[in-house]
A protein has these predicted regions:
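Short hydrophobic/aromatic-rich motifs at helix boundaries and adjacent loops
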Residues: 29-30, 45-48, 74-77, 103-107
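Hydrophobic alpha-helical transmembrane segments
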Residues: 40-52
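N-terminal membrane-targeting/pre-transmembrane regions
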Residues: 1-42
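Single-pass alpha-helical transmembrane signal-anchor segments
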Residues: 16-26, 49-63
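A membrane-cytosol interface segment of integral membrane proteins
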Residues: 107-152
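Conserved beta-hairpin
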Residues: 53-88
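Surface-exposed loop/turn and secondary-structure junction residues enriched for glycine/proline
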Residues: 7, 12, 34, 45, ...
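Acidic, Ser/Thr-rich low-complexity segments on the non-lumenal side of membrane proteins
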Residues: 70, 85-121
Length: 152
């Protein structure tokens, strides 16, 4: 079984989410009193709204920590930022990680490419090892299919 999650992106996203929440909270605490020459003034609701915006922004950053790839002898489960796919090995032609590509992808028999955002070039050798492990699982499945098709 192979399970992969991006490492570098998760660290950056968590740090960004915490920073954004802290900044919005600090801005919210500084919003008090009159707005200058106008008639408005900042109230408790305005402060809570700023904190709420910070929470929503942080959750937006944390969406990018969602990608994951889990593969076993039966197939591959790919969870990207938005959307999830569960594919048996029978529909997969190969595992690609082209030079210069930001992430690996699955090449399907219907000529579609399914990106695997969890296998990012930013993770360098860790991503390459994960792609090799996926290719080994795919080759093992192909060998098992060839053995099953051979008459005895």
């Amino acid at each position: 079984m192979v399970t992969v999650r991006p490492r570098r992106v998760r660290v950056v996203c968590w740090a960004s989410a915490v920073t954004l929440l802290v900044v919005f909270s600090l801005v919210a605490t500084s919003l008090t009193g009159a707005t200058g020459d106008g008639y408005g003034s900042f109230q408790r609701g305005d402060q809570l709204a700023m904190v709420g915006l910070g929470v929503f922004g942080a959750l937006g950053f944390l969406l990018f920590t969602r990608p994951r790839v889990v593969a076993d002898a039966r197939g591959v489960r790919v969870r990207n930022v938005i959307g999830s796919y569960e594919l048996p090995w029978e529909v997969i032609r190969g595992v690609r990680f082209d030079r210069g590509a930001p992430w690996a992808s699955l090449e399907l028999h219907d000529d579609d490419l399914l990106p695997m955002v969890a296998l990012q070039a930013a993770d360098k050798e860790r991503a390459v090892e994960a792609v090799r492990a996926l290719r080994r699982l795919h080759q093992a499945h192909l060998a098992a299919m060839a053995d099953a098709a051979t008459p005895r």
